[in-house]
């Protein structure tokens, strides 16, 4: 792994040296170019297009800030309510799944239900195999 890194580093250095020697490499002085660019930008006043884009950008940022503040107002944390009988407070989102007071429970008719016959009173041979 180290040999591969060393070989690739030598190859890159050789390519840079060849390009620099042939004059095809970038021979621009970056410090002088940066100072010229800085002086040029300070001398020329911003154009109307740049001013327009800056004001549009500021307006968009203010709009986004307003939207974020509205979103924070909407998504406030819910207050907790406590229910009698449970002893622990629940938030309002999970309260709907727990609360069953409003629902009426199904009434089961016990008159048709067959109760088992005691085995000590009747012999096993008298019981039918089917309940029909």
Swiss-Prot record:
InterPro entries: Osteocrin (IPR021088). Induction: Is down-regulated by 1,25-dihydroxy vitamin D3. GO terms for biological process: cell differentiation; cell surface receptor signaling pathway; endochondral bone growth; hormone-mediated signaling pathway; negative regulation of D-glucose import; negative regulation of dendrite extension; negative regulation of osteoblast differentiation; ossification. The keyword Secreted applies. Its main location: secreted. It is found in: Secreted. GO terms for cellular component: extracellular space. Transmembrane segments: none annotated. Residues 1-25 form the signal peptide. Belongs to the Osteocrin family. This is Osteocrin. It comes from Rattus norvegicus.
């Amino acid at each position: 792994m180290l040999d591969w890194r060393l070989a690739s580093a030598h190859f890159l250095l050789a390519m840079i040296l060849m390009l620099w020697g042939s004059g095809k490499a970038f021979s621009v002085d970056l410090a002088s170019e940066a100072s010229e660019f800085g002086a040029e930008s300070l001398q020329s006043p911003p154009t109307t297009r740049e001013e327009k884009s800056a004001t549009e950008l500021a307006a968009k940022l203010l709009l986004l800030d307003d939207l974020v503040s509205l979103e924070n107002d909407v998504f406030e944390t819910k207050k907790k309510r406590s229910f009698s009988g449970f002893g622990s407070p629940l938030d309002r989102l999970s309260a709907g799944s727990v609360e069953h007071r409003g629902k009426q429970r199904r009434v089961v008719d016990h008159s048709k239900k067959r109760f088992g016959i005691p085995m000590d009173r009747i012999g096993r041979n008298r019981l039918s195999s089917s309940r029909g």
